[in-house]
Amino acid sequence: RHQIAHVARWSRPRLRPCDLANAVSAGKTQAVPYGVTLIMAPWNYPFLLTLEPLAGALAAGNTVVIKPSAYAPASSAVLKQICEEAFDPRLVTVVEGGRAENEALLDECWDKIFFTGSVPVGKLVMERASKNLTPVTLELGGKSPCIVDATANLKVAARRIAFGKWLNVGQTCVAPDYLLVDTRVHDELLGLIKEEVRRMFGEHPLDNEDYGHIVNAKHFARVRGLIDPDKVVLGGTARESSLKIEPTILDGVTPDDAVMQEEIYGPILTVLTFESL
């Protein structure tokens, strides 16, 4: 509804000033559809991160091919069913599959590619798109820090950090990846975060049906391998049979530790300290 209500205003021609050499001319910009677009969606929030760009693409007058992630096959099947029931296939088409299908789609010449996912795959998408000078929107991950100084409201900070970190068991591109905390409030903040974790998931998170799973065995092994037992101050236990890892805090981490060399994308919060900003 929002797109439909505003797209006419968004696409209205807009007058633009001209430079001195073209002072007698009149300039304007005109918004037009890109054309045939490709949306490559991730597995962590498959409906939101597929349907949101789809709504924008359709409102702007484009046709769309959707490629859901093979890591979420059940969601992919539901998205395909919804689109087949709601849209003419000439307007919206869903292509399911894995790496082979991704490669085949990237061999095509698109008018626009919208990709959400990891940095390595994002680099590949941009490289392949560059061969046809296809414009690309990349929504990638990163190591998002939380910085807490001595003036912060620690209860609010703890609640927000815990929610952002362990929502979807850390499998969120904007989840806090590591915590930079003033040494003066370090102990109090960690105590409050631990309280929030217990409030959210109870004393036994691995038995909590509302506490999520790591997406697959490959990612489970990678995330578990980042846990340094000597630095665990909360959690640290993993259950391979259910692909669950406890909400885990690693304290006393240094920038050279293995866990600081890549995006965690799991339920591990690493803690570093500072004396002053």
Predicted regions and their residues:
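Short, conserved active-site loop motifs that form the nucleotide-linked donor/cofactor pocket
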Residues: V92, I268-L269
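N-terminal Rossmann-like NAD(P)+-binding subdomain of aldehyde/semialdehyde dehydrogenases
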Residues: R1-K28, R199
